[in-house]
A protein has these predicted regions:
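HhH-family (HhH-GPD) DNA N-glycosylase catalytic core used in base-excision repair
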Residues: 1-224
Length: 224
């Protein structure tokens, strides 16, 4: 499915979204600092194994100036301290996520003095180059070596983080089994799609309420 499709346009650009629902991560765009947005999107991508909803993204965005989301500070805490503050802040997720986040903060602090923006620049602000770099840095940036989570993360950085990435449109993810049936309703037969398409399918599957055209940005919705 092309990025110019009606589904993607409604999800990403239309004021009405999909039955009023938009990309749940868009609340991060309200944070003024680019570096803070990148911190938020990075932790969100780590937590987002099953797509965070808008409420969880908004709660995360409200913590944009907390030390947990500042790698130069978080890197010098201990893994148990990270877990304790996540629990205190009611950031839900498996306990191992705390150690993963701690390792990632230590990695970006050690290599780029805690700056995700510098990591992006060092890889020419190129999505394909960044994916290769992350795949080769599994110990330093655990989980981001995986092709799906790295593609989702880079998609968020390009669309919401405020950093334009070259070759963003070439990112792909494998459709998860639960999205295949939904994808077929939109004529998608490919096994791999752009992460933006996958995110749009996820939101459509939970938001479609067969609302009239004036309440939804998707023309020709297969749910009607």
């Amino acid at each position: 499915m092309p990025l110019s499709s009606l589904l993607v346009q409604a999800f990403n650009d239309h004021p009405l979204g999909l039955c009023g629902q938009h990309d749940p991560a868009k609340s991060v765009a309200s944070v003024e600092s680019v570096e803070q947005r990148l911190n938020l999107l990075t932790l969100g991508a780590v937590l987002d194994t099953n797509h965070l909803n808008a409420e969880r993204w908004s709660a995360l965005a409200a913590l944009h100036d907390h030390w947990l989301l500042d790698p130069p500070q978080a890197a010098y805490k201990s893994s148990p301290q990270i877990l304790a503050i996540m629990q205190q802040l009611h950031i839900a997720g498996p306990q191992y996520i705390a150690r993963v986040w701690w390792q990632i903060c230590r990695g970006v602090q050690g290599r780029f003095k805690g700056s995700w923006r510098d990591l992006l620049k060092a890889n020419d602000d190129n999505a394909q180059t960044l994916q290769r770099y992350l795949q080769q840095s599994q110990t330093t940036f655990p989980v981001f070596a995986g092709p799906v989570i790295s593609a989702r993360w880079l998609d968020l950085i390009h669309r919401i983080g405020g950093v334009t990435l070259q070759d963003w449109d070439r990112l792909t993810v494998t459709l998860p089994p639960e999205q295949i049936k939904t994808a077929r309703k939109f004529g998608i037969t490919e096994a791999e799609v752009h992460p933006l398409v996958s995110s749009a399918l996820e939101v459509w599957s939970t938001s479609c309420r067969n609302l009239p055209a004036e309440s939804c940005g998707l023309a020709g919705c297969p749910g009607k």
